[in-house]
Amino acid sequence: MEFCVLFGGASFEHEISIVSAIALKEVLKDRIKHFIFLDENHHFYLIEASNMHSKYFAQIKEKKLPPLILAHNGLLKNSFLGTKIIELPLVINLVHGGDGEDGKLASLLEFYRIAFIGPRIEASVLSYNKYLTKLYAKDLGVKTLDYVLLNEKNRANALDLIKFNFPFIVKPSNAGSSLGVNVVKEEKELVYALDSAFEYSKEVLIEPFIQGVKEYNLAGCKIKTDFCFSYIEEPNKQEFLDFKQKYLDFSRNKAPKANLSNALEEQLKENFKKLYNDLFSGAIIRCDFFVIENEVYLNEINPIPGSLAHYLFDDFKTTLENLAQSLPKTPKIQVKNSYLLQIQKNK
């Protein structure tokens, strides 16, 4: 089976998406037929596999690449001989952050009837916004940490609104990869933390910070009626897993497997199933959980995890191919014009 990797995008996580695509190339190798790069101006470009390395993208603004146009079933490429269509195999949406995870690309791919692996529109909207994720989890009976939601209008009253003690963690509501996230240990650190978070999002979440809390990450997908899980990761971290630890540490190829009881493993998987539901059909997602006093709490849903969390799966290629055979289908609307014909007939 062949794939096409779509990466880049106009978001703060643009470079992270490039790193993910390069990593996935090493895993899937010749199964990837095309690499499609989406730049910050929303232009699509075809990238040769031999150019999928960091040095090339560090200088990509100096390259003169012919832009492509997204169309039904593929991409259009203009040439001296006319317009040529590049037919796309199954697309892997690997655009992190805005564009890829907020629903824009999902709607575009669905509109042009291009088959893809990744979250659909509703799943993207709910998981990209951390506040909406909390509401979604609560409705499903999945616990989350207490929180305060701030915007520019009420940020001046932050200390009055926060009902829990220092330290607490400040994070943008609409951003991933630990961008704009800071731990606040005393009042004088709050202004900087808020300024940093509001750079990435119009809304900011504040949660209690629990030193040394147990954190477990679980990736997976639903293939027909059965769930396929990765092994459960227990991240090695300092206070929290920051941007550098996630994306600039190339010393690890495999994540540390968690040592936990069968009962706790089952709890994590049951919570994952509730969250995945049918909403995330067609996607490999990663749920990050906290365990506090033997209770499982959702930290966040990552709808497009870095490199699709391939490092957590014992057989990632098989998982991906099986998921490709179990994608949600959009019903085709049959337009018959029966009402218009009846109106015309009655004239």
Curated annotation (Swiss-Prot):
Catalyzed reactions per annotation: 2 D-alanine + ATP = D-alanyl-D-alanine + ADP + phosphate + H(+)
Gene3D superfamilies found in the cross-reference section: 3.40.50.20, ATP-grasp fold, A domain, ATP-grasp fold, B domain
Localization: Cytoplasm
Annotated positions binding Mg(2+) 2: E300, N302
ATP-grasp domain location: 134-332
Superkingdom of the organism of origin: Bacteria
Keywords per UniProt: ATP-binding, Cell shape, Cell wall biogenesis/degradation, Cytoplasm, Ligase, Magnesium, Manganese, Metal-binding, Nucleotide-binding, Peptidoglycan synthesis
Record's protein name: D-alanine--D-alanine ligase
Encoding gene per record: ddl
